[in-house]
Every structure is written in structure tokens, then in C-alpha cells.
Amino acid sequence: IMNYNPTDDWTNVFMYSDKTIPVLYSNLRELKKVTEDPIVLAIADIIKVAAMHRVTDAYGPIPYSMIGENGQIQVPYDSQEKVYDKFFEELDAAIKVLTEHRTDAISAKADYIYGGSAEKWCKLANSLKLRLAMRIVYANEAKAREMAESAVNSEVGVITSNADNARLTSFGADGNPIYVAVNYNKPADCLTGGDTHAAAD
């Protein structure tokens, strides 16, 4: 109550402090310059969707379908419905590639999450697809059902045990940016997360 006027610090967690969009798309652009490996590119798309769905869930309409064209970051915004449609399209393409290459792998040195396992990445993609389907259940029940059933009935399936959880092994000075969000405004000696709500400061 002492500070009634809200600060804008909390909005920086996804868009400014961690530079989600610029860093993500510049890395994708550089990746496509050095490899044509379909497994690597499919994994990159899964990571992109995993990151960007949190952005649209936080802010609603975002630049997405046209972003990265000719290296552009500042492009027209898409409706959240269009963004989610694109998510499903990209996940389906990644799932198709990884299902076809499920017994293959990439170098473990290039994969800090699954050690190069294409099959585990495919399970993550299906699980992410299921999560996104549940997100839209009140907006488009028919599509939510279609996407959810498709994910669960996939040849590879979804994550069903902790052994297949996606865990990022931190390296260097950088960790998972979601850790920053969860611990934002966290009081000393607090055993739970912080508070990222507007005016939480």
C-alpha cells in the first residue's frame, strides 16, 4: 500500500530483461546458417514455441508469424488465436520430423536438456501440444480436443514419467530465465517463489 502506483519492472521479466524475442530469433537465424539437420531445426522450433507461448500467455497479441522475415523483429502483431494456430502448425511439423528420426540422435554436447535424444524431444513436443490444447479449451473446444487427442495418441506419445522431463543444465553464468521470473521479488529466506504481479514492488 505504501507504493500504490505500480512500477513497470515486472513487465521486463519476459520481454526486456531477458530479451526473449531478439535473442531467440537471432539464435535461430544463426543456427540455420550452420546446419540443415532436420532434427536440430525441429528441436529449435520446439524451443521457440516453448518460449513464445509464455510471452503470448502474458501479453496476448504478439509479433509472431512474420517475425524474423528478412531479419526483422519489429513486425505487425498477430492475434493470440493466430499465434496459437502457428504454434500447433510448427509443433506438428517438428513432431513429424522427430517421429521419423526417433531412433536417431544429435551430439550430446549440443543438447543440454536431453543429451541428443530425438525421441525425448518428440515426447516434449507432444506434451507441449497437449498443454497448448488445454490453454484454448474455453476459446475453441473443438480444436482443443483435436489437438489434445492428436498429442496423446501420437506414435511416440507424451511425457509420462519424470525421467523424460525437460531439465536445462545451467552452464556458464546464465541459467534458465524462468528462474528469474519465479524468484522475482522473492524475500530473503522465503521457501516459495516471489511475486511478479503488477505493483508487486
Where are these regions (language model features)?
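Structured, solvent-exposed acidic/aromatic patches
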Residues: 2-47, 51-201
